From Swiss-Prot:
Keywords: 4Fe-4S, Iron, Iron-sulfur, Isoprene biosynthesis, Metal-binding, Oxidoreductase
GO aspect biological process, one term: dimethylallyl diphosphate biosynthetic process
Function: Catalyzes the conversion of 1-hydroxy-2-methyl-2-(E)-butenyl 4-diphosphate (HMBPP) into a mixture of isopentenyl diphosphate (IPP) and dimethylallyl diphosphate (DMAPP). Acts in the terminal step of the DOXP/MEP pathway for isoprenoid precursor biosynthesis.
Protein encoded by which gene: ispH
EC number(s) stated in the UniProt entry for this protein: 1.17.7.4
Cofactor notes: Binds 1 [4Fe-4S] cluster per subunit.
Family membership noted in the UniProt record: Belongs to the IspH family.
Organism of derivation: Vibrio parahaemolyticus serotype O3:K6 (strain RIMD 2210633)
Pfam families in UniProt: LYTB (PF02401)
Residues that coordinate or bind [4Fe-4S] cluster: C12, C96, C199
Official protein name in the record: 4-hydroxy-3-methylbut-2-enyl diphosphate reductase
Annotated CDD domains: lytB_ispH
Cofactor(s) required, per the database record: [4Fe-4S] cluster
Length: 317
Protein backbone atom coordinates (compact mmCIF):
# COMPACT_ATOMS: atom_id res chain seq x y z
CA UNK A 1 0.00 0.00 0.00
CA UNK A 2 1.31 3.45 -0.96
CA UNK A 3 0.44 6.64 0.94
CA UNK A 4 0.69 9.97 -0.90
CA UNK A 5 0.60 13.22 1.12
CA UNK A 6 -0.75 16.34 -0.62
CA UNK A 7 0.92 19.75 -0.70
CA UNK A 8 0.00 22.36 0.32
CA UNK A 9 -2.18 21.20 3.20
CA UNK A 10 -3.14 22.20 6.72
CA UNK A 11 -2.87 25.56 8.43
CA UNK A 12 -3.28 28.72 6.36
CA UNK A 13 -2.01 32.16 7.41
CA UNK A 14 -5.41 33.23 8.77
CA UNK A 15 -5.74 30.15 10.98
CA UNK A 16 -2.15 30.46 12.16
CA UNK A 17 -2.81 34.09 13.13
CA UNK A 18 -6.09 33.30 14.92
CA UNK A 19 -4.56 30.55 17.04
CA UNK A 20 -1.54 32.74 17.83
CA UNK A 21 -3.88 35.50 19.04
CA UNK A 22 -5.54 33.15 21.54
CA UNK A 23 -2.20 31.71 22.66
CA UNK A 24 -0.64 35.15 23.13
CA UNK A 25 -3.69 36.47 25.00
CA UNK A 26 -3.52 33.49 27.37
CA UNK A 27 0.18 34.11 27.91
CA UNK A 28 -0.06 37.87 28.47
CA UNK A 29 -3.36 38.18 30.34
CA UNK A 30 -3.74 34.72 31.90
CA UNK A 31 -6.92 32.61 31.84
CA UNK A 32 -9.77 32.83 31.51
CA UNK A 33 -9.80 34.26 27.98
CA UNK A 34 -13.17 34.15 26.25
CA UNK A 35 -13.47 33.32 22.54
CA UNK A 36 -16.69 33.97 20.64
CA UNK A 37 -17.30 30.83 18.60
CA UNK A 38 -14.62 28.22 17.90
CA UNK A 39 -11.59 30.29 16.88
CA UNK A 40 -11.12 27.85 13.98
CA UNK A 41 -13.24 24.85 13.04
CA UNK A 42 -11.03 22.06 14.34
CA UNK A 43 -11.86 19.95 17.39
CA UNK A 44 -8.20 19.08 18.08
CA UNK A 45 -7.18 22.76 18.15
CA UNK A 46 -10.17 23.90 20.22
CA UNK A 47 -9.69 21.17 22.85
CA UNK A 48 -6.01 22.10 23.16
CA UNK A 49 -6.86 25.77 23.76
CA UNK A 50 -9.56 24.83 26.28
CA UNK A 51 -6.97 22.92 28.28
CA UNK A 52 -4.85 26.09 28.40
CA UNK A 53 -7.70 28.22 29.75
CA UNK A 54 -9.67 29.48 26.75
CA UNK A 55 -13.44 29.50 27.22
CA UNK A 56 -15.49 29.23 24.02
CA UNK A 57 -18.94 30.85 23.90
CA UNK A 58 -21.45 31.42 21.13
CA UNK A 59 -22.85 34.78 22.27
CA UNK A 60 -21.37 37.85 23.97
CA UNK A 61 -23.87 37.75 26.83
CA UNK A 62 -21.99 34.63 28.01
CA UNK A 63 -18.86 36.76 28.57
CA UNK A 64 -18.77 38.31 32.08
CA UNK A 65 -18.12 42.04 32.42
CA UNK A 66 -14.54 43.31 32.54
CA UNK A 67 -13.18 40.37 30.57
CA UNK A 68 -11.27 39.78 27.35
CA UNK A 69 -13.05 38.35 24.33
CA UNK A 70 -11.55 37.20 21.04
CA UNK A 71 -13.55 37.16 17.81
CA UNK A 72 -12.99 33.99 15.77
CA UNK A 73 -11.29 33.79 12.38
CA UNK A 74 -14.72 33.66 10.71
CA UNK A 75 -15.54 37.27 11.62
CA UNK A 76 -18.54 38.86 13.34
CA UNK A 77 -21.34 41.25 12.45
CA UNK A 78 -21.29 44.97 13.18
CA UNK A 79 -23.99 44.33 15.80
CA UNK A 80 -21.64 42.05 17.74
CA UNK A 81 -18.86 44.64 17.57
CA UNK A 82 -21.24 47.32 18.81
CA UNK A 83 -22.41 45.13 21.70
CA UNK A 84 -18.80 44.49 22.77
CA UNK A 85 -18.09 48.22 22.60
CA UNK A 86 -21.17 49.12 24.65
CA UNK A 87 -20.16 46.62 27.33
CA UNK A 88 -16.61 47.96 27.28
CA UNK A 89 -15.15 44.48 26.76
CA UNK A 90 -11.49 44.19 25.78
CA UNK A 91 -11.56 42.78 22.25
CA UNK A 92 -8.89 41.08 20.18
CA UNK A 93 -10.02 40.45 16.63
CA UNK A 94 -8.85 37.17 15.07
CA UNK A 95 -10.94 37.67 11.92
CA UNK A 96 -8.96 36.46 8.92
CA UNK A 97 -7.77 39.48 6.89
CA UNK A 98 -9.18 37.84 3.75
CA UNK A 99 -12.61 37.70 5.41
CA UNK A 100 -12.18 41.34 6.45
CA UNK A 101 -11.61 42.16 2.77
CA UNK A 102 -15.06 40.74 1.96
CA UNK A 103 -16.56 42.66 4.90
CA UNK A 104 -15.14 45.88 3.47
CA UNK A 105 -16.65 45.15 0.05
CA UNK A 106 -20.08 44.66 1.63
CA UNK A 107 -19.77 47.79 3.79
CA UNK A 108 -18.74 49.83 0.74
CA UNK A 109 -21.74 48.58 -1.24
CA UNK A 110 -24.02 49.25 1.73
CA UNK A 111 -22.86 52.88 1.96
CA UNK A 112 -23.73 53.28 -1.73
CA UNK A 113 -27.14 51.64 -1.16
CA UNK A 114 -26.23 48.92 -3.67
CA UNK A 115 -27.91 45.56 -3.30
CA UNK A 116 -25.53 42.68 -2.55
CA UNK A 117 -25.67 38.95 -3.25
CA UNK A 118 -23.58 36.72 -0.99
CA UNK A 119 -22.65 33.27 -2.27
CA UNK A 120 -22.32 31.08 0.81
CA UNK A 121 -23.74 28.42 3.11
CA UNK A 122 -26.59 29.44 5.41
CA UNK A 123 -25.73 29.13 9.09
CA UNK A 124 -21.97 29.29 8.65
CA UNK A 125 -20.46 31.89 11.04
CA UNK A 126 -18.53 33.58 8.23
CA UNK A 127 -21.79 34.08 6.34
CA UNK A 128 -23.50 35.48 9.44
CA UNK A 129 -20.64 37.91 9.99
CA UNK A 130 -20.56 39.02 6.36
CA UNK A 131 -24.34 39.51 6.16
CA UNK A 132 -24.00 41.59 9.32
CA UNK A 133 -21.85 44.19 7.56
CA UNK A 134 -24.82 45.39 5.51
CA UNK A 135 -26.95 48.19 6.95
CA UNK A 136 -28.55 50.05 4.03
CA UNK A 137 -32.29 50.47 4.57
CA UNK A 138 -33.03 51.18 0.91
CA UNK A 139 -30.95 48.37 -0.60
CA UNK A 140 -30.88 44.71 0.35
CA UNK A 141 -28.57 41.74 0.85
CA UNK A 142 -29.40 38.23 -0.29
CA UNK A 143 -27.83 34.81 0.28
CA UNK A 144 -27.58 32.17 -2.46
CA UNK A 145 -26.01 28.71 -2.25
CA UNK A 146 -26.65 27.18 -5.67
CA UNK A 147 -27.31 28.30 -9.27
CA UNK A 148 -30.96 27.35 -8.71
CA UNK A 149 -31.21 29.98 -5.95
CA UNK A 150 -30.27 32.74 -8.40
CA UNK A 151 -33.51 32.46 -10.38
CA UNK A 152 -35.49 33.25 -7.21
CA UNK A 153 -33.69 36.59 -6.90
CA UNK A 154 -35.44 37.95 -9.99
CA UNK A 155 -38.56 38.60 -7.92
CA UNK A 156 -36.60 40.14 -5.03
CA UNK A 157 -33.85 42.37 -6.44
CA UNK A 158 -35.04 45.97 -6.70
CA UNK A 159 -32.45 47.39 -9.11
CA UNK A 160 -30.66 44.79 -11.30
CA UNK A 161 -28.48 47.55 -12.77
CA UNK A 162 -26.89 48.32 -9.39
CA UNK A 163 -26.07 44.90 -7.97
CA UNK A 164 -22.85 43.52 -6.43
CA UNK A 165 -21.81 39.99 -5.43
CA UNK A 166 -19.31 38.60 -2.91
CA UNK A 167 -18.65 35.07 -1.68
CA UNK A 168 -17.73 33.09 1.40
CA UNK A 169 -13.97 32.52 1.33
CA UNK A 170 -13.99 28.75 1.95
CA UNK A 171 -16.31 27.50 -0.80
CA UNK A 172 -15.63 25.09 -3.63
CA UNK A 173 -13.98 27.03 -6.45
CA UNK A 174 -16.01 25.13 -9.07
CA UNK A 175 -19.37 25.56 -7.31
CA UNK A 176 -18.78 29.27 -6.81
CA UNK A 177 -17.90 29.68 -10.48
CA UNK A 178 -21.20 28.01 -11.44
CA UNK A 179 -23.19 30.40 -9.24
CA UNK A 180 -21.31 33.44 -10.56
CA UNK A 181 -21.97 32.32 -14.14
CA UNK A 182 -25.69 32.07 -13.38
CA UNK A 183 -25.68 35.47 -11.63
CA UNK A 184 -24.13 37.07 -14.71
CA UNK A 185 -26.65 35.35 -16.98
CA UNK A 186 -29.66 36.51 -14.94
CA UNK A 187 -28.20 39.92 -14.00
CA UNK A 188 -25.87 41.02 -16.85
CA UNK A 189 -24.95 44.27 -15.07
CA UNK A 190 -23.93 42.65 -11.77
CA UNK A 191 -20.54 43.72 -10.41
CA UNK A 192 -18.09 41.60 -8.45
CA UNK A 193 -14.79 41.93 -6.62
CA UNK A 194 -11.70 42.72 -8.67
CA UNK A 195 -10.25 39.45 -7.40
CA UNK A 196 -12.14 36.28 -6.51
CA UNK A 197 -13.12 36.14 -2.82
CA UNK A 198 -12.13 32.45 -2.53
CA UNK A 199 -8.99 32.57 -0.39
CA UNK A 200 -5.57 31.48 -1.65
CA UNK A 201 -5.40 28.56 0.81
CA UNK A 202 -8.82 27.21 -0.22
CA UNK A 203 -7.79 27.43 -3.88
CA UNK A 204 -4.38 25.83 -3.31
CA UNK A 205 -5.72 22.92 -1.25
CA UNK A 206 -8.43 22.21 -3.80
CA UNK A 207 -5.86 22.32 -6.62
CA UNK A 208 -3.68 19.84 -4.68
CA UNK A 209 -6.64 17.45 -4.37
CA UNK A 210 -7.29 17.76 -8.10
CA UNK A 211 -3.67 16.80 -8.78
CA UNK A 212 -3.73 13.86 -6.39
CA UNK A 213 -7.23 12.41 -6.82
CA UNK A 214 -6.48 10.74 -10.14
CA UNK A 215 -3.43 8.95 -8.73
CA UNK A 216 -5.05 7.38 -5.64
CA UNK A 217 -7.89 4.96 -4.88
CA UNK A 218 -9.14 6.73 -1.75
CA UNK A 219 -8.67 10.20 -0.21
CA UNK A 220 -8.52 10.89 3.52
CA UNK A 221 -9.08 14.54 4.46
CA UNK A 222 -7.89 15.60 7.90
CA UNK A 223 -10.41 18.09 9.27
CA UNK A 224 -13.51 18.50 11.41
CA UNK A 225 -17.03 18.03 10.09
CA UNK A 226 -17.93 21.67 10.79
CA UNK A 227 -14.96 22.90 8.72
CA UNK A 228 -16.29 24.25 5.43
CA UNK A 229 -12.98 24.12 3.55
CA UNK A 230 -12.23 20.57 4.76
CA UNK A 231 -15.68 19.37 3.70
CA UNK A 232 -15.17 20.90 0.25
CA UNK A 233 -11.93 18.89 -0.15
CA UNK A 234 -13.76 15.63 0.54
CA UNK A 235 -16.57 16.60 -1.84
CA UNK A 236 -14.07 17.55 -4.55
CA UNK A 237 -12.32 14.18 -4.34
CA UNK A 238 -15.68 12.43 -4.65
CA UNK A 239 -16.66 14.64 -7.58
CA UNK A 240 -13.46 13.52 -9.31
CA UNK A 241 -14.41 9.88 -8.76
CA UNK A 242 -12.26 9.10 -5.71
CA UNK A 243 -13.96 7.95 -2.47
CA UNK A 244 -13.30 10.50 0.27
CA UNK A 245 -13.40 10.42 4.06
CA UNK A 246 -13.24 13.32 6.52
CA UNK A 247 -11.77 12.72 9.97
CA UNK A 248 -10.23 14.63 12.87
CA UNK A 249 -9.55 11.60 15.06
CA UNK A 250 -7.17 8.68 14.34
CA UNK A 251 -9.48 6.28 16.21
CA UNK A 252 -12.32 7.03 13.77
CA UNK A 253 -10.41 5.66 10.78
CA UNK A 254 -11.85 2.32 9.65
CA UNK A 255 -9.86 -0.52 8.02
CA UNK A 256 -12.62 -1.05 5.43
CA UNK A 257 -11.82 2.36 3.92
CA UNK A 258 -8.72 0.78 2.43
CA UNK A 259 -9.98 -2.67 1.43
CA UNK A 260 -9.04 -3.44 -2.17
CA UNK A 261 -7.09 -0.17 -2.46
CA UNK A 262 -3.41 0.20 -3.41
CA UNK A 263 -2.88 3.98 -3.09
CA UNK A 264 -4.14 6.30 -0.34
CA UNK A 265 -4.13 10.09 -0.67
CA UNK A 266 -4.01 12.25 2.46
CA UNK A 267 -4.60 15.99 2.71
CA UNK A 268 -5.73 18.44 5.40
CA UNK A 269 -8.08 21.39 5.58
CA UNK A 270 -6.79 24.87 6.41
CA UNK A 271 -7.73 24.50 10.09
CA UNK A 272 -6.03 21.12 10.66
CA UNK A 273 -2.65 21.17 12.46
CA UNK A 274 0.32 19.15 11.21
CA UNK A 275 0.46 17.34 14.55
CA UNK A 276 -2.97 15.87 13.84
CA UNK A 277 -1.99 15.05 10.24
CA UNK A 278 0.96 13.04 11.57
CA UNK A 279 -1.28 11.15 14.00
CA UNK A 280 -3.66 10.29 11.16
CA UNK A 281 -0.75 9.15 8.97
CA UNK A 282 0.58 6.87 11.71
CA UNK A 283 -2.85 5.30 12.11
CA UNK A 284 -3.20 4.71 8.36
CA UNK A 285 0.31 3.20 8.17
CA UNK A 286 -0.60 0.88 11.02
CA UNK A 287 -3.85 -0.23 9.33
CA UNK A 288 -2.46 -0.78 5.82
CA UNK A 289 1.01 -2.00 6.72
CA UNK A 290 2.83 0.86 5.00
CA UNK A 291 6.29 1.86 6.22
CA UNK A 292 6.60 5.30 4.69
CA UNK A 293 4.73 8.26 3.22
CA UNK A 294 5.55 9.91 -0.11
CA UNK A 295 5.06 13.68 -0.03
CA UNK A 296 3.83 15.23 -3.27
CA UNK A 297 5.40 18.50 -4.39
CA UNK A 298 2.98 21.42 -4.51
CA UNK A 299 2.61 25.17 -4.61
CA UNK A 300 4.73 26.95 -2.02
CA UNK A 301 2.90 29.27 0.38
CA UNK A 302 4.59 32.20 2.11
CA UNK A 303 1.61 34.27 3.25
CA UNK A 304 1.88 35.65 6.79
CA UNK A 305 -0.51 37.80 8.83
CA UNK A 306 0.66 39.72 11.91
CA UNK A 307 -1.12 39.45 15.25
CA UNK A 308 -2.41 42.72 16.79
CA UNK A 309 0.36 44.98 18.08
CA UNK A 310 -0.91 44.70 21.66
CA UNK A 311 -0.10 40.99 21.56
CA UNK A 312 3.30 41.24 19.88
CA UNK A 313 5.27 42.72 22.79
CA UNK A 314 5.48 41.33 26.29
CA UNK A 315 3.74 43.84 28.54
CA UNK A 316 5.40 44.98 31.73
CA UNK A 317 3.27 45.78 34.79
Amino acid sequence: MKILLANPRGFCAGVDRAISIVERALELYQPPIYVRHEVVHNRFVVEGLKQRGAIFVEELHEVPDNNIVIFSAHGVSQAVRQEAKQRDLTVFDATCPLVTKVHMEVARASRRNMEVVLIGHAGHPEVEGTMGQYSSETGGMYLVETPADVEKLKAIVKDPSDLHYVSQTTLSVDETADVIEELRRVFPDIQGPRKDDICYATQNRQDAVRELAGDVDVMVVVGSKNSSNSTRLKELAEKLGTPGYLTDCPEDIKPEWFEGKTKVGVTAGASAPEELVNQILERIKELVGARSVDEVLGREENMFFEVPKELQIKQVD
